[in-house]
Amino acid sequence: MIELKRLKLINWHNFENVTFDCARLTYMIGVNAVGKTTILDAIRYCLTTNRNFNALGNKKSGRTLQGSVHAKQRGENAYRRPGRTVAYIGAEFWDTVKRTNFVIAVRVESEGPMQELHPGDQTWYISEDGITLEKLPFLDPRTGAPSAKEDFKPAVGRLSYTRSPSEARDRICRALGIGRASSPLGKKFNEVFQMGTSMDEIPNFREFLYQYI
């Protein structure tokens, strides 16, 4: 079994540098607009490359990837980070069979909240076994700012990367023991993960049970 153990967010909406512990069953409790859904957005984006952030309770919010990176506030065109911003999401896993950790991460670089992202602005990373969040330099130790692309690598060990969302989905599915993203199980993983974290209504629950469960 592969378990999500910790999640790290750098410059993701109102989270500037936080690390969450995760368990097999994790509750996220809080008042509205405290950031629960943005955490789910981060997990979904990191593991599936899906940028559809508008969940059932926030259809009018118009949440976007750039909005999360630049920390869009409730006011129109109000952002906590209006200029060039780099964000990181890191998910640390534990493989119970191999008895080792590994990390899946994504880096986003955006020039501004209204600027369209370029193909090279998103980079997904998958570490080799034995890497934890602490072994990856999410922040530049000299400046405290998010690390540059060329500096985001462990001191010991390797880190593969891709800027292609489709290639990232394929590599992530393989790292999680699912196989290719285009396989029947890979397709179901991406579909069900979206359903399970978006809070969208399931139109036909019986069909959902028969098809996915």
Regions found by a protein language model. Give the residues of each.
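Generic recognition of flexible, low-complexity loop/linker segments
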Residues: 17, 77-78, 194-197
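Extended, Lys/Glu-rich alpha-helical coiled-coil stalks
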Residues: 143-213
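Active-site-proximal structural scaffolding
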Residues: 21, 36, 82-84, 202
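Pre-Walker A-like glycine/lysine-rich segment at the N-terminus of P-loop NTPase domains
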Residues: 1-48
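A short hydrophobic beta-strand->loop->alpha-helix junction that borders the nucleotide-binding pocket
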Residues: 58, 93, 194-195
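N-terminal membrane-targeting/anchoring modules of bacterial envelope and secretion proteins
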Residues: 48, 88-90, 99, 190, ...
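Post-Walker A helix-loop "phosphate-sensing" segment adjacent to the P-loop in P-loop NTPases
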Residues: 45-57
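Nucleotide-state sensing region of NTPase/ATPase domains
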Residues: 62-174
